[in-house]
Every structure is written in structure tokens, then in C-alpha cells.
Regions:
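Mid-chain, well-packed structural core segment of small domains
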Residues: 62-91
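Short, charged/polar low-complexity linear motifs in solvent-exposed/disordered segments
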Residues: 26-27, 38-39, 74, 91, ...
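Hydrophobic residues in beta-strands and at strand termini
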Residues: 14, 79, 123-125
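HotDog/MaoC-like acyl-thioester-processing domains
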Residues: 1-7, 83-127
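Hot-dog-fold acyl-thioester-processing enzymes
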Residues: 1-71
């Protein structure tokens, strides 16, 4: 692994079942994550995934690439455009720093509406 290496692209289909089940699994009962009618009444296009799901997807993207021995040390993300039901969330990543056993990965998750999440993940990998 070298600085500048790209991670393989990963796509997540945000089906309504995915949006609702991940919100409930993270105990996020806000109606905008499971009730389409109320989400639309509140000005949203549809239900959308929550921040805990987004954070988990970012971590999974990096650790699936790095392998089971990778240890996540830091996650710093910024949310952008919502990821609505029926969107495809496409993840891209690049190694931006390597130091002994530590890697810093820049991650972007994008839908047709723009960047849903941008961030940095720092991991420790065995030598």
C-alpha cells in the first residue's frame, strides 16, 4: 500500500428497507428515516439514511478494503446532500498518508444529488 493508492469503488443501494432498517438498528426513530409522508411534509424528497448509518458505511468501506486486522483509530466525516431511498451511494477512497502501521484514507460517498459524505479515516494495519 502506498500514498496515492485508490480504493475500489463500492456501491450501496439505498432501498427503502435499507434506509428504515438501518435507522431502527441504530435506534434512530426520527420520522424522516422511516415515514415517507412525514419526510415529504417536512420538505424532504423522501426518507433518507441517518448519520450513524453513513458513519458505519464509511468505516465498512475502509475496513473491507484493509482487511479484518485493520483497526479504525479515527473517523472524521462531514455530511452533504442527503442519501434518499432509491439512491445509489457510491464510495471512493484514496490513501493520502502512510506512516509505519498507520494509514490515512480520504473517503467520498456520492449520489446523483452530490457528495453525501466526505471524510478522513485513520486506521492501523499490521506490519
Amino acid at each position: 500500500v502506498r500514498t496515492g493508492d485508490s480504493l475500489p469503488e463500492w456501491h450501496v443501494e439505498a432501498t427503502p428497507t435499507f434506509v428504515i432498517s438501518t435507522a431502527l438498528a441504530t435506534r434512530d426513530f426520527q420520522d424522516v428515516h422511516h415515514d415517507r409522508d412525514l419526510a415529504i411534509q417536512r420538505g424532504s424528497k423522501d426518507i433518507f439514511i441517518n448519520i450513524l448509518t453513513t458513519t458505519g458505511l464509511v468505516q465498512r468501506y475502509v475496513t473491507d478494503w484493509a482487511g479484518p486486522e485493520a483497526l479504525v483509530r479515527q473517523v472524521n466525516i462531514r455530511l452533504g446532500a442527503p442519501c434518499y431511498a432509491y439512491d445509489t451511494l457510491k464510495f471512493f477512497g484514496q490513501v493520502i498518508e502512510k506512516d509505519d502501521q498507520d494509514l490515512t484514507i480520504e473517503v467520498v460517498g456520492r449520489t446523483d444529488h452530490g457528495d453525501h459524505v466526505t471524510g478522513i479515516v485513520k486506521i492501523e494495519v499490521p506490519a
